[in-house]
Amino acid sequence: MRPKVFITRAIPENGIEMLKEHFEVEVWPEEREIPREVLLKKVRDVDALVTMLSERIDSEVFDAAPRLRIVANYAVGYDNIDVEEATRRGIYVTNTPDVLTDATADFAWTLLLATARRLIEADHFTRSGEWKRRGIAWHPRWFLGYDVYGKTIGIVGFGRIGQAVARRARGFGMRILYYSRSRKPEAEKELGAEFRSLEDLLRESDFVVLAVPLTKETQYMINEERLRLMKKTAILVNIARGKVVDTKALMKALKEGWIAGAGLDVYEEEPYYNEELFSLKNVVLAPHIGSATYGAREGMAELVARNLIAFKNGEVPPTLVNKEVVKVRKPGF
């Protein structure tokens, strides 16, 4: 009898087809997030679970799933999963790093450039017919933004995505600063990056890109005190997690001019709506789509499948998060 895997949202077919060769596969068929009560019913007889970052996978889920041996998160982040509890129970947890690195780094630059050059404002001005109504072909003061080439970028979090952001910054002739829990000498040499304390990075940077995982240490690390350290002409880009930034402090900074603007792809709660924040013209907003390219999504689906197939074959999954779990239980169903 094949082990059973439940997938909480439809992922690209390439991953599903790979899984069907080894597993009995069930996919939640709806576009909306799976309701909690439905998830708890579905996991009762599954051996493996493929989850999205929107699902909370905790003791309640583990209690409802006595056969569960592995959770494959369709994301690079895994703060939606109680990894410590999973490890205690001998449940393997995997994620999807690397395959979405370039797409996410590209999107950080999309937000940075769109905010710096006021692209959304200009788009609305053109699309709404206001340009035509004004009857002026060109004006020297319309939508003045900020130069990017040759400026200083500060990257908070210098893992795969942070370093990919830095590689792109080299093409813009930028000075690259970074803050990380530990220094990265090889990356410094390759990218010409300079290590700074978080406070010094915020003071010196024209653009600050957040690319850290959400942990106890990074939660609300960008607060009012630190926002006040930034230049008044600086732009903040968050592609990390919403709770890395204190939203109330950020709104105050944007409204009172402590910083020039922000580009956000992530929020404290998702889905998210904040009329006060969303009414501000100096913020560019996206609904958590940093890795949303066809190539990245298909790569993530393939990696999910590879992790589950490896586990089924008694092998340690390629991107195992909780490596210490192998001491609790050997891979395999």
Curated annotation (Swiss-Prot):
This protein's GO CC annotations: cytosol
Binding site for NADP(+): 158-161, 180-182, 239-241, 288-290
Xref: CDD domains: GDH
Residue ranges crossing the lipid bilayer per the database entry: none
Enzyme Commission number(s) of this protein: 1.1.1.26
Domain of life: Archaea
Location of this chain's protein in the cell: Cytoplasm
Enzyme class at the top of the EC tree: oxidoreductase
PROSITE patterns registered for this protein in UniProt: D_2_HYDROXYACID_DH_1, D_2_HYDROXYACID_DH_3
Swiss-Prot/TrEMBL catalytic activity: glycolate + NAD(+) = glyoxylate + NADH + H(+)
An annotated Gene Ontology molecular function: NAD binding
InterPro entries: D-isomer_2-hydroxyacid_DH (IPR050223), D-isomer_2_OHA_DH_cat_dom (IPR006139), D-isomer_DH_CS (IPR029753), D-isomer_DH_CS1 (IPR029752), D-isomer_DH_NAD-bd (IPR006140), Glyoxylate_reductase_GyaR (IPR023519), NAD(P)-bd_dom_sf (IPR036291)
Pfam families: 2-Hacid_dh, 2-Hacid_dh_C
UniProt keywords, alphabetically: Cytoplasm, NAD, Oxidoreductase
UniProt-annotated catalytic positions: 241, 270, 288 (proton donor)
Family: Belongs to the D-isomer specific 2-hydroxyacid dehydrogenase family. GyaR subfamily.
Subunit structure comment from the entry: Homodimer.
NCBIfam families per the UniProt record, alphabetical: PRK13243.1
Designated name of the protein: Glyoxylate reductase
Organism: Thermococcus kodakarensis (strain ATCC BAA-918 / JCM 12380 / KOD1)
Gene that encodes the chain: gyaR
